Amino acid sequence: MMEYFYRIYGLRVQSQIPFSEAVPETAGEAEVKIVFGRMPDFLLEAGQKGYGTWTNGFVSAWFRIRDGTQVYVEGGSRITVELSEEPQLLVITSLLLSAGMALVCLQRGEPFFHGSALYTGEQAILLCGESGAGKS
């Protein structure tokens, strides 16, 4: 299987999934790995109950995308992706770069801001706040 290396949020990421939006990086020791695989057995119950998300504090987290693809983020160093029968790759890559990598940063103890940004040529402003605060 093809392996890709990127620099994402300052971390060297080794991925089995290509990201056209990410900055390519030379091969080397990865701080984060994104791999295809099966979800851990203990998450079967969450999926059967119809849950869409599950967390174990800042140690691990799981979420299901609308197309049925499942993502498990653990230890701030690994993202496992189990594709659905009809995966929507654009949605999957977008959520891996946003929610997936945000969970990696949180699990690593990195500060992470929930915000919206505006860019006007030479200047930018970042609006941060809790969900529902009106940043959109």
Regions found by a protein language model. Give the residues of each.
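Conserved glycine(s) of the Walker
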Residues: 133-136
